[in-house]
């Protein structure tokens, strides 16, 4: 999704008879504004807060079972870029964790890439080496999850994913993943086209210009 916007917008300008919708795009309201080019994205920070609560419950369980002390409730976050979307996401996640375990602390590491399996796995491994007992991510590969699954040591390292379930690659360490369900958006987009309406006028949610 990220990075496709400029190219798709160029194509949309050449084909005004077709509606183009780019999830996670950010240029629909930039000049030239096209009536057939749209961006959409979910309020993923809300899902990340819920995932943080789940992570906090696991940390609390580990504390109560004597696996870690409250001071050892350290979480690591594999982040792609220092964008507002990423920062709001890990902030929401951290607040969710601390709503259950107030003593929890966090380490962040930016990879400067959305999709690099080996780098994301290495970053997660380094965070684990710095005593993080739970890893989450705002990046696109399974690298962090596999790092948690393969981590040795006496303390298990759990994982909270993004965009997809990680249970296949981390069956003993994956807790939950935050994902955006675009089905409603595209159902309403189709409805809008069938009834001659503007897509954003048919979305029951926050919209701004060509963005929903």
PLM regions with names:
Residues 1-212:
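A residue-level marker of the well-folded mature domains of exported/periplasmic proteins
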